Each structure stands twice: as structure tokens, then as C-alpha cells.
Amino acid sequence: MSHDPLSTDAEVASPAFSDKDNVGGDYSASSIRAVMINRPRQELYDFWRDFSNLPLFMENVKAVEMLESGRSKWTIAGPGGKDVELVSDITEDVPGEKIAWTSSEDSDLDHEGWIAFKDNAFGRGTEVRVFISYDPPAGALGKVVAKVLQREPRVQARGELRRFKQLMETGEVSTSKAPDAAPRADRHF
């Protein structure tokens, strides 16, 4: 599993989000995403570590079931309406700082990853960084189909971190209607 430092605080301090793809790892596709969240590090870690909270902001996660010995079974909406089951083993758990995992032998998707929580160098908020490495089902074709359908883990991670930030800072995840459905101010004269 890749544990290399991939950016400095300065690289993610000014923008709210940072994205990098193909950054290493044991599998053919990898990605790192980072976001600054204006909440204490321990609070963010505690919320994430309770895996039952994850479907609150992860659109495609239908359920997370805790199994024995640090294992969890995830049911995820996959491409074409077919659910994918991921069985993960926690490989590292540093309270308040980091959670790392890898797929178990009975997982539908070979994957590994970690999420790290670090105090912002400027004393405000927390840098949350997620690393994902995986082998796409059905190889390159499966990767393309998943990306087009917005079901690719790298694409999903960006949105999930955005929604996590919204939920932790405001208490809700914002949604928006299509522009045609939203009322327009100029229609109310």
C-alpha cells in the first residue's frame, strides 16, 4: 500500500479541494483526493470511523455491515444497476489520524485505501486526504463504463469528499434541482 506523502500542506491550503490520479498503489488505478474541512480532526475521524454514517454522504453506498475483527461488508450501487459487494479489512487504525483498509479475498473488487486527518498547518480546520487504489472489474472497458456512468471510485471520491465537507460544516448535504425546475427571480414580476 502506498504511504508516500503526496502533497504538502501548502498545496492544499488555498483551494478547498485537491485531486491527483495515478499516484501509486498495488492496483492498476489509483487516486488521492484532499479537502479542507472547518471542523476538529477528532470529530471528523470519529464520524468517519462509525461506518454506519458513510451512507449519509456516499451516494452509491447502500449499506455497510460490520463483521468480525475489523472487517466490513459494503453494498455499493455499481454500473448498470448491478450491486457490487466489497469486503474490507482494516489494516491500520490510528485514532484521530488514519484508517487504512484492503480488500479481503471474498470481495468483488480488489482495492486498498486510506483516509488521513491532519490539523491544518494554519491552525484552522482539518485536511482530510483519501487514497484509493483498485483493479476495475472487467479491466479497461469496465473502467470506462464506470467513469461514464459516474460509478468509478475516483470520480465518486471527489463528490463524496465534497458532501462530507458539507455535512460536517453545515449539518446537511446540499442538493440542487435542474435549472428548468428551479424558480427564476425574473418570473415573479
Report residues per predicted region:
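Short beta-strand micro-motifs enriched in acidic
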Residues: L67, T91-D93, A116-N120
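Beta-strand/loop substructures that line and gate deep hydrophobic ligand-binding cavities in soluble
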Residues: S2-F17, V23-G25, V84, T102-L161, ...
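Intrinsic-disorder/low-complexity, polar/charged segments enriched in Ser/Thr/Lys/Arg/Asp/Glu/Gln
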Residues: S30-A34, R71, E85, K98, ...
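Hydrophobic ligand-binding cavity/cleft-lining segments
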Residues: S2-R71, R158, R163, L167-S174, ...
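Short beta-strand segments that buttress and anchor functional surface loops
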Residues: S72-P79, I99-D106
